[in-house]
Structure formats: structure tokens, C-alpha cells
A protein has these predicted regions:
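DPxDG-like acidic metal-binding loop motif
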Residues: 55
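Exported/periplasmic ABC-transporter solute-binding proteins
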Residues: 1-34, 39, 43-50, 58-68, ...
């Protein structure tokens, strides 16, 4: 069985895992998938690692394009996602319907899980800047809990380590037992676009092309939507 290597952001993992399995069954090609935040994967590529297909944030793909590491014209927008708040299923849901209500919910909670900014996850970096801008960083810092780098914030809801979790919506939905409170309100939110591409030097460009075509299919779009992403 031939093999196709894929570097994919965890931002699409909730949808892509099943889609990748479907591709393996239909194509007979084994996928060797490495999951991580876009910055984690970019660091591995900078260190000399390679893949056939990439699924990253648009910023990640563009950074690689500037280095000549993505086949020109191969990039395709797949879906986009915003940042959401989740609680453990059945727990009280705070009001986050306006920026002020969101701010008060953060101040009132006992603990909140988010991605560690140093790991480079888009939502974690954004949240650190957001609470500074809102003037509540000092009040929140003792409450913030981090999963392992590349991990899922909602997992800390299940262990009782966090009362709220903040991350890309599909990443929150990846954890069974989490429940979405809502998206961050209005212009407080951050929208991330996820893009696929073929890495320069791929040993299986035909397989990578076929995978990307499948990820654009109407069936794939339905899966993206069901998992909290907005299909392109």
C-alpha cells in the first residue's frame, strides 16, 4: 500500500479525522498524519521535515509559499472557524452575548482553559492579547489553565480543572461531553481560514491532489459544517 504524508492543524481535526479515514478506504492509500498547531508544524518544516499534503491556517500556508515550500497554485480554501466558549455538558452557561457580558463572564468564572500562547495556537495568542486590550489580564491570569501543547482545552472541563474553555469551535466539539455556550461576540471574535496545499518536493503529488479534491467535495463540506466549521 502506498503512503501519503499529511501535516494538519488540530483546528480541523474533528472533521478531518473521519474524512482522512474515508480517503484511505476509497483510495487504498495509507495516510501518515501529523497533527499540531500551525506554528508547531511550521517549526517541524523549518527543521527539515516534509509532507505531501498540508492543511494549515492561511497564514501558515502563505508563510510556506514565501519560502517556496508549497506547489504554486495548489492551495485551496477548505473552511473557516471562529473562537467559542464551552462548558461541561449540563453546567450553567454564562451570558456572552455582548462584549461587556463576555468580559463579566470571564471575571466571574473560577477558571478558564485556553491554549498556551507560547505554543502558538491562534486562539491562545489572540486571547492573551484580547484580555490585555480589555484590561482584565491581571485579574484572569491566576484563573487560566493550559492543556499540553497542541491539546484540547475542553479536556480540562472533563477533569474539573476548568469551568470554561476557549478555543476554535471545532476543537471544543472534538471533546465528548463539552457543550458550546456560543461564539465570542461580534468583533471580539477571531476568524481563522484553513487552507490545503501540496508541499514542494512531494513524492506523491497525485495522491495529494486527490486528497485535496476529496476535502472540497460536497460530502466533506457537510462534515465540516457538522463539526462546527464554515465550509469555503
Amino acid at each position: 500500500m502506498s503512503e501519503l504524508t499529511v501535516f494538519s492543524t488540530i483546528g480541523v481535526r474533528s472533521a478531518a479525522e473521519g474524512l482522512f479515514q474515508s480517503y484511505e478506504k476509497s483510495s487504498g492509500i495509507k495516510l501518515a498524519v501529523t497533527w499540531g498547531t500551525a506554528p508547531m508544524l511550521l517549526k517541524r518544516i523549518d527543521g527539515g521535515e516534509t509532507a505531501d499534503a498540508l492543511v494549515l491556517s492561511r497564514a501558515g500556508i502563505e508563510a510556506l509559499q514565501q519560502q517556496g515550500k508549497v506547489v504554486a497554485g495548489s492551495e485551496v480554501a477548505l473552511a473557516s472557524s471562529g473562537v467559542a466558549i464551552a462548558v461541561k455538558r449540563g453546567a450553567p452557561k454564562p451570558d456572552i452575548s455582548t462584549p461587556e457580558a463576555f468580559k463579566q463572564a470571564l471575571l466571574a468564572c473560577k477558571s478558564i482553559a485556553c491554549s498556551e500562547p507560547s505554543a502558538g495556537g491562534a486562539s491562545g495568542v489572540y486571547f492573551a492579547k484580547l484580555i490585555e486590550r480589555m484590561g482584565i489580564a491581571d485579574a484572569l491570569k491566576p484563573k487560566i489553565k493550559y492543556p499540553p501543547p497542541g491539546g484540547f482545552c475542553a479536556a480540562l472541563l472533563m477533569t474539573g480543572e476548568a469551568e470554561l474553555a476557549l478555543q476554535q469551535k471545532p476543537e471544543l466539539l472534538h471533546i465528548e461531553g463539552s457543550e458550546i455556550v456560543g461564539m465570542l461576540p461580534g468583533d471580539v471574535n477571531l476568524i481563522t481560514e484553513f487552507v490545503a496545499g501540496i508541499m514542494s518536493g512531494s513524492k506523491n503529488t497525485d495522491g495529494a491532489k486527490a486528497l485535496i479534491v476529496m476535502l472540497q467535495s460536497s460530502a466533506a463540506k457537510a462534515v465540516f459544517q457538522a463539526k462546527g466549521l464554515e465550509p469555503a
